[in-house]
């Protein structure tokens, strides 16, 4: 019956700009805060899916005068894996995604490999990429 008539999928409530800014304002300057700030602002500014965010590597970034250009090598909407480019401009406020990403990469000394990585309970940044599930948990924890 469900297949014949269809049912709406349960979706999470969207995170609106003002809500995001409120979450960002609660963050400090710890390594974890810097990572989460960069992740949330980049995801929002670029309209990235979780899987796209965790799949980004340093080599995917091109710095241009107006900000950054990311090359997405594959995504849910790019089944042929042709890739696409997404531009992220500099912002004019403390919510600038480019500045937040640069602060995270510098603080974590990331020069290559995955952009967004787990941080151990001892404050060490690992070499692996965050998982999509970790991004969901991070967001849930920050929004609550």
Please report, for each region that a protein language model flagged, where it lies by residue:
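Conserved catalytic core of the tyrosine transesterase superfamily
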Residues: 1-144
């Amino acid at each position: 019956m469900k297949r014949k008539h269809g049912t709406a999928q349960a979706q999470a409530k969207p995170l609106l700009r003002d809500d995001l800014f409120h979450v960002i304002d609660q963050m400090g300057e710890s390594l974890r805060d810097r990572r989460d700030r960069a992740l949330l602002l980049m995801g929002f500014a670029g309209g990235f899916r979780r899987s796209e965010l965790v799949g980004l590597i340093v080599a995917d970034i091109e710095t241009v005068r107006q900000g950054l250009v990311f090359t997405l090598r594959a995504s849910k909407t790019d089944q042929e894996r042709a890739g696409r480019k997404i531009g992220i401009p500099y912002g004019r406020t403390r919510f600038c995604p480019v500045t937040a990403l640069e602060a995270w990469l510098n603080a974590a000394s990331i020069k290559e490999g995955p952009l967004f990585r787990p941080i151990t309970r001892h404050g060490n940044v690992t070499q692996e990429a965050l998982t999509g599930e970790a991004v969901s948990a991070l967001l849930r924890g920050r929004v609550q």
